[in-house]
Amino acid sequence: MEKNNNKKRATVRIQGQTYKVVSSEEPAHVKEVASYMNKKMEELKKRNPYLDSTKLAVLTALNIADEYLKLKRQYEGE
C-alpha cells in the first residue's frame, strides 16, 4: 500500500458540487480531468435535460469508457 506522503490535494467542481480529491497526480491534472468530466456531463445534460444526477454520472462514465476503449484499441493496433 502506498504511503500518503506523495499525495497531493485538489478541489474541483463538477455539476455544481465541490469535491476534495487526494491523488498522486498534480492538482493541475486532476482539475483537467474534472473539467473534462464536467464538459461531458454538460453535453449529455443538454441532450437529456431530465436525467437525474446519478443517471447523468453513470451515462457520462459509460461514454468516457467507450471513448477510452476505442482509443486504446487504436493505439494497440487492433
Swiss-Prot record:
Localization annotation: Cytoplasm
Signal peptide per UniProt: none
Domain of life: Bacteria
Major site of localization recorded for this protein: cytoplasm
Keywords from the named record: Cell cycle, Cell division, Cytoplasm, Septation
GO biological process, any: septin ring assembly
A Gene Ontology cellular-component term: cytosol
Disulfide bonds listed in the record: none
InterPro entries: Bac_CellDiv_Activator, Cell_div_ZapA-like, Cell_div_ZapA-like_sf
Family affiliation: Belongs to the ZapA family. Type 2 subfamily.
Role of this protein: Activator of cell division through the inhibition of FtsZ GTPase activity, therefore promoting FtsZ assembly into bundles of protofilaments necessary for the formation of the division Z ring. It is recruited early at mid-cell but it is not essential for cell division.
Subunit-level organization: Homodimer. Interacts with FtsZ.
Protein's UniProt name: Cell division protein ZapA
